[in-house]
Amino acid sequence: MMRKMIFIRAAAVCAVMALGFSVSCKKNAERTMVTFFMGTVEVLRNGASVKPAIKMEIQDGDVIAAGPESFILLQVAESMVIRITESSTVEMKSLLSPKNRELLVRRGKALSAVRKLGKDGAFTVKTATITASVRGTEFSVSSRPKESVVAVRKGTVEVTVIASGTGETVGEGKAFVYTDRAATRTVTAAEDRELEMIGAIPAIPGLGEKTEQEIRDIILPLLGDSGIAAMTLDEVKEKYRRTDTVILYDGRIITGVIISRGPVFAIMTAKGVVSVPEKKIRNTRVTPLQ
């Protein structure tokens, strides 16, 4: 009898733990977390400015502001990835409820790659003048003075003009532009590149269990040139297997790694990326890493 009672109690404890674990997993699965950021980014929460960090949880009502040459990546549950681009301000209206996820782009641009939303899931991105609703797609929504744009790379987006209530379905390769009237055009090459990049970034399974370095190692190689700017000098040296010495006409010497050439050279140094006009460069020397 005693053995039977112990078994029943143990079974009850296991059931409670399993239920708690299930609820915890469900709660964790709905979290929105920072997976990467670069430059000047701040999270405005309850009137205070909070510095972002990888694995930081984003809450409903938070406003994220990215400065020039800056951006931030968010992962919502395991269903979507969002990139808030430079010079943008985006409010997290409702991200914790899978049935009604919503962003408000106050200015700038938000790129979204929606993987899965579930049977009753919904995701909406708004500006002051339009609403874009999706179930699964790669798209961007931008807000500038007197203009809102929705660009679609994959899937379809239902766009509604708030003032008139009129709607339009925007398909792959198309962009909906609203000023004082609505128009449709082909997505630009720049828009397509942006969306291709956000589409390549995965929704990381078990994100909450990953270390910051593990997340960084997953995301960084997928960011292209913007990822290089976020790397340390040692990481860039390892990537390119060299050190560059740049000698200027005014006698200055810059040591680092040249990460792009053209009318203006971009050079990764110990203090970050510096830009130097080509006409100011006397010559360069390359030292391969051993």
Residue ranges and their predicted role:
Residues 2-12:
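Bacterial N-terminal signal peptides that target proteins for export
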Residues 25-63, 67-69, 74-242:
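Flexible, surface-exposed loop/linker segments and immediately adjacent secondary-structure boundaries
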Residues 224-290:
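Conserved RNA-binding domains used in RNP assembly and mRNA/RNA metabolism
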Residues 11-20:
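Bacterial N-terminal signal peptides
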Residues 1, 23-24:
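Short, low-complexity interaction segments enriched in Ser/Thr/Pro/Gly
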